[in-house]
């Protein structure tokens, strides 16, 4: 380790993909936020604030471990890397390179994930995946088809301009604390309505102006009922639909056969709440 004196530097929080600015003070051992380009309010969530604690935590692994019977024993880095090389070489020789698979992580940097996939290619396989596929691949595909881009179509600051939020099947109060505490909650306190669709009650529910406790697995009937109410009560933005949305006619024709009360009750929600 270097004996050079360390000074706090502005960096990016490594916990998730929001990209909040973070700086670390070695004297206090605390992490604080700064007004970065993404989170301009300079706030960090408890998870990001605890990022530095992981580095020095007593349970953090700093030495390679290999299995010995029912337990793990420490070995040198040279031994561990040698075992990996020997095992990979044996697998490639016996079953071919496509018997290998590499699983990347969203908690790694872009550079780390890039190096991992280059190692996979060097060994002759394209079997590279990422943990984000389990939770985001369907989102990216659906948003790409419906909105033209598999990512958010607005900035965080745009959230403050909304008159109402519809949060379905998510708990941003705990899952996305920066967005919730810095953007959603202040707006709700200023009069923006928050409609929370979730079978459970949680911190997001407690901040919501309306809670629709949909039965698990019945989101589609609920959303069909909501859509029919919007159409029946003339709440659509016709100018927006005309210039920005395709397939409006087919969409409205589908709802000719949708009965609001039946779908709402199927979803376990009082039709009057819609």
Predicted regions, residues:
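Molybdopterin (Moco) oxidoreductase catalytic core of the xanthine/aldehyde oxidoreductase family
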Residues: 237-248
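N-terminal export/assembly segments and adjacent metallocofactor-ligating motifs
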Residues: 1-233, 247, 251, 257, ...
